[in-house]
Regions:
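PRPP-associated nucleotide enzymes
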Residues: 1-319
Length: 319
């Protein structure tokens, strides 16, 4: 069954998590957001009503599972179920920020692997494939039993630092897990710049203790590269040790600006000169906080999935 004559098969929907990004992606596609209502009953249950006919259509639903994570996750699952039951030809879950990605392994034998469970739930709800950006660990790609498009924001983040003198900067990974990301950023911004790494410990969740740093940042403008800013504790600790090691200044960039309560205030009082994040999660630029747009990367991924453009690579290999 095909859509009516003259009607594109593409439908782009948004939940409540980040309608601004969804609208930007739709505009990049020369499309309008399709009609859907996602509301909450008085008892807290979520209701989804799809107003556009999705039968035999190619549906893309854009919904980061950012805070409140559980609410936005349930919204996404219910939307996928609604599309599937209404006869959509294909349902692609576009999840710019994948909540639960930091629970990708067990630290004790009696913990769940929450990131894997969420991947399973997406498949059960009706997702045909998933598009996401900068998962915490590359190994998480194996959690999905569906086709996965894993995008990376580094080219857009690097563009925010295009004006720096490559001879005067140093790139810093705030922990061992961010080294590959920092090295990839270095190749985009300043291929000859030194790369440093901060060694940290977490005595308790959301607490950070820096133990050491490797790499020469003396007299240089340091740029810390990470995937997520949550409490700001990691960035603050890394910035402090970088300055103690003789850096002239320190800035930071990350894909996902989660910004837990109090994080903005922590970073506003920090020595960081610039903090650059993307709009995978809704956040308003203010002061030293800058927000760059990744809508074009998602739009290009959608075009590639639909076979409309195949010559441009949108997913890079960053662990």
């Amino acid at each position: 069954m095909q859509p009516p004559d003259g009607q594109s098969s593409l439908l782009v929907f948004s939940g409540n998590a980040n309608p601004a990004l969804a609208g930007a992606i739709a505009r990049e596609m020369d499309a309008a957001l399709a009609a859907i209502t996602v509301s909450t009953f008085r008892d807290g249950e979520t209701q989804v009503v799809v107003h556009d006919d999705v039968a035999s259509r190619d549906v893309f639903v854009i919904q980061p599972t950012c805070p409140p994570v559980n609410q936005h996750l349930v919204e996404l699952l219910l939307m996928l179920d609604a599309f599937r039951r209404a006869g959509a030809q294909r349902c692609t879950a576009v999840i710019p920020y994948y909540g639960y990605s930091r629970q990708e392994k067990r630290t004790t034998p009696q913990e769940p692997i929450s990131a894997k469970l969420v991947a399973n739930l997406l498949a059960v709800a009706g997702a045909s494939q998933v598009v996401t950006m900068d998962l915490t660990a590359g190994a998480m790609e194996g959690f999905f039993d569906l086709p996965l498009v894993h995008l990376h924001a580094l080219p857009v983040l690097a563009g925010a630092f295009a004006g720096v003198d490559p001879n005067t900067v140093a790139i810093v990974a705030p922990d061992l897990g961010a080294v590959k990301r920092a090295e990839a950023f270095q190749q985009l911004v300043a291929p000859r710049a030194p790369v440093g790494v901060v060694f940290k410990e977490r005595p308790r969740p959301d607490e950070v203790a820096v133990s050491d740093m490797v790499g020469d940042v003396r007299g240089r403008h340091a740029i810390i590269v990470d995937d997520i800013i949550s409490t700001g504790a990691t960035l603050l600790a890394a910035a402090q040790i970088v300055l103690r090691r003789g850096a002239r200044s320190v800035s930071a960039c990350a894909t996902h600006g989660v910004f837990a309560p109090g994080a903005i205030e922590v970073l506003a009082a920090s020595p960081l000169e610039r903090i650059v994040v993307t709009n995978t999660i809704p956040v308003e630029p203010r002061g030293r906080l800058e927000v760059v747009n990744v809508a074009s990367l998602f739009a290009e991924a959608i075009r590639r999935i639909r076979g409309e453009r195949r010559q441009v690579a949108v997913a890079s290999q960053v662990g």
